[in-house]
């Protein structure tokens, strides 16, 4: 009996000793074995881009923690004062199609960049290439190529990495002696008014709309040569494209469709407005148009019919200028500084935001020349040289403002961190990330 008790006592002592060893090893505090609440608190102070691309790859536990979509959604809502997305009755929310991780990272990356633009970007002005107002600009191929056109009837193709500032140390806007890769002084017989690519991420062709009643096709792979001229019969004020299908908005209130494989004549025409078609925007299989008659219309390219038209844009003396359509919002910018929110799925008017308040009658209004949406951000540019950056929530929440070195801006484009504007004084103005140098 005593032997049995002694055996049990020894076994208990061994278990106690092993427990003490395990306790000692577990008491070693490492980041990996911290409670999840503490890990999340630490993560809330870190760069979301670092969390996704570095910390989540350290170990399986971190990957599992950061894979929670609700976590990224919480971080998005902690950044804003309103609601995101701007509308809460979207089908993509019901179907869980919104990538909250992408939204959170996009918000953080863009805010850091544009809130400290002097440290993060090179601000460069290019002059003496065009000799009249540069009315339209375009960025393609991840911001590596820029195309410009203007009232000198010419077009230029720029290799963005070649646009280097004269003074690398000066944070003020600097001049560049960069020359375009190709230039066509006689691209059109009238003003070049709008540009569009066949595919913005891997463009091989660019389409130019002009007051000479044509839309021309330019091949980026064969020396910027014109390979087709579409006959519009009236001044072309806007153009969009998807692959081989090209659509042009005309001064005559019509919208024409062309097929690059068919030839120079239109394959379809429709008339959704009672005034000149001022802007077009393509989204999925649809094309939105706005007109001087202050209405919005949407065309279904697949069905070949109007989905909706005569959607009133509530402006007094203003007229619509630009369109931006994303999965979460459809915006129309007008000539008096207001941004009008439309439902991106139903295309009905929701609300107007006064981005630039109407000034006294003796001062000019700020026209919204361009509007750009990314997963979490909104960029709005005025013709008075002010560019505002917002979280794309409701209402839009401004976090940065950048001023151009001019008061006469014609158009703004943004792609992959590169921003360019056209100017009335025949110059182009670039903001290029420092890491590209």
Whereabouts are the PLM-identified features?
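WD40-repeat beta-propellers
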Residues: 155-159, 209, 215-219, 255-259, ...
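Blade-level signature of beta-propeller repeat domains, shared across WD40, Kelch, NHL, RCC1
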Residues: 410-437
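Canonical WD40 repeat/beta-propeller blade segments in eukaryotic WD-repeat proteins
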Residues: 131-138, 189-197, 229-242, 275-281, ...
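Solenoidal tandem-repeat scaffolds enriched in leucines and small polar residues
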Residues: 228-309, 313, 318-323, 327-329
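Structural hallmark of WD40 beta-propellers
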Residues: 52, 143-147, 202-207, 225-228, ...
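Intrinsically disordered, low-complexity acidic/Ser/Thr/Pro-rich linker and tail segments
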Residues: 2-44, 49-138, 142-144, 149-181
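Conserved strand-to-loop turn within each blade of WD40 beta-propeller repeats
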Residues: 149-152, 209-212, 249-252, 290-293, ...
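Short C-terminal beta-strands that terminate individual repeats in beta-propeller domains
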Residues: 125-129, 167-177, 181-187, 226-231, ...
């Amino acid at each position: 009996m005593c032997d049995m008790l002694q055996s049990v006592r020894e076994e208990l002592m061994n278990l106690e000793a092993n427990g003490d060893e395990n306790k000692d090893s577990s008491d070693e505090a490492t980041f990996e074995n911290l409670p999840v609440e503490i890990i999340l608190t630490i993560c809330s102070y870190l760069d979301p881009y670092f969390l996704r691309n570095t910390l989540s790859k350290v170990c399986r536990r971190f990957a599992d923690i950061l894979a929670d979509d609700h976590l990224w959604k919480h971080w998005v809502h902690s950044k804003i004062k309103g609601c995101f997305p701007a509308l809460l009755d979207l089908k993509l929310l019901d179907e869980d199609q919104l990538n909250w991780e992408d939204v959170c990272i996009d918000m953080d990356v863009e805010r850091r960049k544009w809130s400290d633009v002097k440290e993060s970007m090179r601000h460069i002005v290019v002059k003496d290439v065009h000799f009249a107002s540069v009315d339209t600009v375009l960025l393609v191929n991840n911001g590596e190529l820029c195309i410009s056109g203007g009232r000198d009837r010419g077009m230029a193709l720029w290799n963005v990495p070649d646009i280097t500032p004269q003074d690398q140390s000066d944070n003020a806007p600097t001049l560049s002696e960069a020359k375009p890769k190709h230039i066509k002084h006689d691209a059109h017989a009238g003003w070049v008014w709008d540009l569009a690519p066949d595919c913005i991420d891997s463009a091989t062709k660019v389409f130019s709309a002009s007051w000479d009643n044509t839309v021309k096709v330019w091949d980026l792979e064969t020396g910027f040569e014109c390979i087709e001229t579409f006959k519009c019969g009236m001044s072309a004020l806007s153009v969009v494209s998807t692959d081989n299908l090209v659509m042009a908005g005309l001064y005559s209130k019509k919208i024409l469709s062309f097929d690059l494989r068919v030839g120079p004549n239109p394959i379809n025409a429709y008339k959704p407005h009672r005034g000149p078609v001022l802007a077009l925007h393509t989204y999925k299989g649809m094309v939105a148009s706005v007109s001087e008659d202050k209405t919005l219309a949407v065309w279904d390219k697949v069905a070949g019919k109007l989905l909706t038209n005569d959607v009133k844009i509530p402006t007094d003396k203003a007229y619509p200028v630009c369109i931006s359509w994303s999965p979460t919002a459809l915006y129309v910018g007008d000539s008096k500084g207001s941004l009008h929110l439309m439902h991106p799925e139903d295309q009905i008017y929701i609300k107007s935001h006064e981005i630039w308040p109407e000034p006294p009658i003796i001062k000019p209004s700020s026209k919204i020349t361009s509007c750009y949406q990314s997963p979490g951000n909104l960029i709005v540019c005025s013709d008075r040289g002010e560019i505002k950056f917002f979280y794309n929530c409701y209402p839009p929440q401004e976090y940065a403002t950048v001023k151009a070195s001019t008061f006469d801006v014609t158009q703004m484009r943004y792609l992959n961190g590169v921003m360019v504007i056209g100017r009335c004084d025949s110059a182009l103005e670039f903001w290029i990330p420092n890491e590209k140098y």
